[in-house]
């Protein structure tokens, strides 16, 4: 079973190198870890990690995306494989972009889906209350920590995890992550489209993080910007992994809508265009 490889910055001199068909994680204070690359679906790096270029090219060769998150979760970088072929799905998606009616259909569907997810989040937080999703932003603002820097740090970290899963999903489908419908002409436009729809789930996981016991051991606010501790990163990853069945279901629903708009005759459309 393929899994996500998470690597977190440490005071120890951790090095990541290739060893045959496996990635070798060398830790001076622990036994070396060897992970066959065929068991890795994506790699997420928090902070600074020494990693050899052989690892980067091996990941690209296996269509495995690499996501890097800065120490303070202020920047996200995504390294993708370089595709020499132009999948038929990409052409179908471009046809959707050129069809204003189909593009509008997807945009309206995305807004409705996002509104439904907002309602679901409100119901989880206040199960006995009859609150409209029109009050969603006020509710989230009320429940946020007073220190907004803490919120941004956690939310950006979650956004990176969601982006990593979405990017992996799109690559596996042969869809261009940059070919956005809502976020046109934007880097990773289609990833942003997915993330726009799924943002209420990010809010919910962020709120749950701040309900954790001993929150002061999870995030440091004695310096700006705020910094997640190793324990805090572990908390966020566990929460994300435990709710992946929901996240993957949402990803699948968005994919189904895209396929509905693109149609199913990929080979026919491709041959006509070529």
What are these regions (language model features)?
Residues 15, 24-26, 33, 43, ...:
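Residues in flexible loops and secondary-structure boundaries
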Residues 1-35:
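N- or domain-start disorder-to-order transition segments that initiate the globular core
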Residues 35-38, 42-83:
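Glycine/small-residue-rich interface belts in oligomeric ring/scaffold proteins
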Residues 33-36, 144-146:
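A short alpha-helix capping/helix-coil boundary motif
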Residues 23, 39-40, 142:
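General secondary-structure edge motif
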Residues 2-15, 75-274:
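Active-site helix-to-loop segments that bind/position phosphate- or nucleotide-bearing substrates
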């Amino acid at each position: 079973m393929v899994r996500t490889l998470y690597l977190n910055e440490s005071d120890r001199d951790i090095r990541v190198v290739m060893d045959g068909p496996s990635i070798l994680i060398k830790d001076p204070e622990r036994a070396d870890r060897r992970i066959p690359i065929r068991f890795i679906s994506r790699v997420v790096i928090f902070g600074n990690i020494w990693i050899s270029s052989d690892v980067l090219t091996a990941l690209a060769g296996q269509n495995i995306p690499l996501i890097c998150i800065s120490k303070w979760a202020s920047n996200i970088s995504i390294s993708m494989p370089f595709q020499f072929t132009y999948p038929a799905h990409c052409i179908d998606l471009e046809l959707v972009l050129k069809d204003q009616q189909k593009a509008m259909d997807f945009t309206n569907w995305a807004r409705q889906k996002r509104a439904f997810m907002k309602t679901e989040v409100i119901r989880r937080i206040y199960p006995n209350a009859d609150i409209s999703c029109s009050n969603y932003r006020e509710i989230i603002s009320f429940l946020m920590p007073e220190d907004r820097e803490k919120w941004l740090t956690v939310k950006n970290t979650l956004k990176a995890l969601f982006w990593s899963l979405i990017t992996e999903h799109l690559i596996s489908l042969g869809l261009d992550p940059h070919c956005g419908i809502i976020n046109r002409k934007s880097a990773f436009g289609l990833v942003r489209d997915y993330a726009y729809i799924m943002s209420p789930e990010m809010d919910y996981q962020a709120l749950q993080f701040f309900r954790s016991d001993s929150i002061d051991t999870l995030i440091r606010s004695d310096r700006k910007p705020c910094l997640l501790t190793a324990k805090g990163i572990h908390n966020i990853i566990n929460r994300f992994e435990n709710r992946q069945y929901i996240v993957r279901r949402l990803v699948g629903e968005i994919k189904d809508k895209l396929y509905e708009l693109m149609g199913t005759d990929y080979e026919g459309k491709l041959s006509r265009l070529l």
